[in-house]
Regions:
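Gram-negative and organellar
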Residues: 1-298
């Protein structure tokens, strides 16, 4: 399946501006330049994705899923923040005859190794390459909920410098439930991970939690929402700035409406906020977007 989308976005922080009035360096306080504070902007969104499902003709229904996407976000004013990304992933699904983990009482367990490659370009210059391997174990529990347990390792290479290059090791656990009688779906996910870089002050531990809710509405509209919170503590003091501890919150709302067999409309609203003990990392903003999608390519 192929999907092509074109959209528009308004953001209150198009220049990735600082949400603070001063910066503390040692015992000194420096005023933040007004041009470094957040400013609004509009951008155009482009996205193409291709997904392929290879049936392995296995009695249990094993398959391989391939996915590729290209996305671009081009700003009207702050073009230095134009961003492009490429994603390629491969996922192999093994439908198991029995549950191999007794502490999960699962029905229809599935084991899924996954490889995900990411490339990010900022203003026509590559800034990041990432290679992630994950091992997922999923199925249905006795209470009717769906469960997903995942271990992952993510190798990151930043073009800006070798000190930040490193790897994430993490685990996540989540469940989703169907609300009786309403077709609503709700769930949660817990994340525990650490990052080990070439410089000790880039080491951190991250703890996160997500809550999600989705529900079909009248006239074929589909509503979905997600709240996520992350708490990230660095192991060592940052040079000049001292202790770094970040708390990040994101709230997403989305409305999707199919139009016929080939077209769909997508409206999104995202609120973000980052609180940090170092003022230059404080950020906040909101994005409002609208996209048109087409998916009937031959």
């Amino acid at each position: 399946q192929q999907n092509l989308s074109l959209g528009w976005k308004h953001t209150t922080n198009g220049n990735s501006g600082i949400n603070a009035d001063f910066i503390e360096i040692g015992d000194f306080l420096l005023d933040v330049d007004p041009e470094s504070k957040r400013e609004g902007d509009q951008s155009t969104l482009y996205n193409y994705s291709l997904s392929i499902d290879q049936d392995l003709n296995h009695p249990r229904g094993d398959n391989i899923q391939y996915f590729f996407s290209y996305g671009a976000d081009r700003f009207n004013t702050y073009s230095q923040f134009d961003i492009q990304s490429n994603v390629f992933s491969t996922r192999r699904n093994f439908h198991l005859d029995e549950n191999y983990f007794s502490f999960f009482n699962l029905e229809d367990p599935v084991f899924s190794p996954n490889i995900n490659l990411l490339r990010v370009v900022l203003n026509r210059e590559e800034i990041l390459r990432s290679g992630r391997i994950s091992l997922d174990y999923s199925g249905q529990l006795d209470d009717g909920s769906s469960m997903l347990f995942s271990y992952y390792r993510d190798e990151k290479t930043f073009k800006s410098g070798g000190q930040k290059n490193g790897r994430i090791n993490g685990i996540s656990f989540g469940q989703s439930y169907v609300w009786p009688g309403s077709q609503a779906l709700y769930g949660y996910k817990i994340i525990l991970e650490n990052y080990r870089a070439n410089a000790g002050f880039e080491f951190y531990e991250n703890y996160g939690i997500e809550f999600s809710y989705s529900q079909p509405l009248k006239e074929n509209w589909q509503f979905s929402s997600k709240y996520s919170y992350q708490d990230k503590s660095h192991d060592e003091d940052y040079p000049l700035f001292g202790d770094r501890h970040d708390q990040m919150e994101t709230l997403r709302f989305n409305l999707l409406k199919p139009i016929g067999a080939c077209w769909s409309l997508n409206f999104g609203w995202v609120l973000t906020g980052t609180h940090s003990t170092i003022n230059i990392y404080k950020r906040s903003g909101s994005n409002l977007s609208a996209q048109v999608n087409y998916q009937c390519f031959k």
